[in-house]
Amino acid sequence: MSLSNEPIQRIAPSVKLGKNVRIFGFTNLYGCEIGDDVKIGTFVEIQKGSKIGHRCKVSSHTFICEGVTLEDDVFIGHNVVFTNDRFPRATTNGQLQTEADWACVPTLVKRGASIGSGAVLLCGITIGEEAMIGAGSVVTKDVPAGATVAGNPARILTKKP
């Protein structure tokens, strides 16, 4: 593992780190698994239960919440946000919700996919192998392998035959 000289890197003991992982400053990692040869930029949070495959790049200001799996060779651009709750609420009956009131909905990003900067991925979807998500897209449903999508909501622009 290689840590930059930048201050404040919070890496909890529960994190499983692979070989040759590069982590830059102002990161917050806990309860996640990080594969070999991964680069994690500044101001990134990766929550418990998330899995990052080998040779992935997670660019700065990205939020990877519980339930997200990135397979090998995935690129995540700057300021990408994943979600894991279909109906987020602080309260439903006037009482602050607890973790018991919440169910994590997982998201899978398959091998070689690329997520453009500023994209938001809603939970419960699969991004297919080698798919490309355009910058600023809001992805609300599955993206087929090899497809390029963009927009809000994201729509298929091209598909590999």
Segments from the language model and where they lie:
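Conserved switch/coupling elements of ABC/ABC-like ATPase nucleotide-binding domains
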Residues: 138, 153-156
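C-terminal/domain-terminus segments
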Residues: 125-142, 146-148
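Flexible, glycine/small-residue-enriched loop-and-beta-strand segment within the central core
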Residues: 2-13, 25-125, 152-153, 160-161
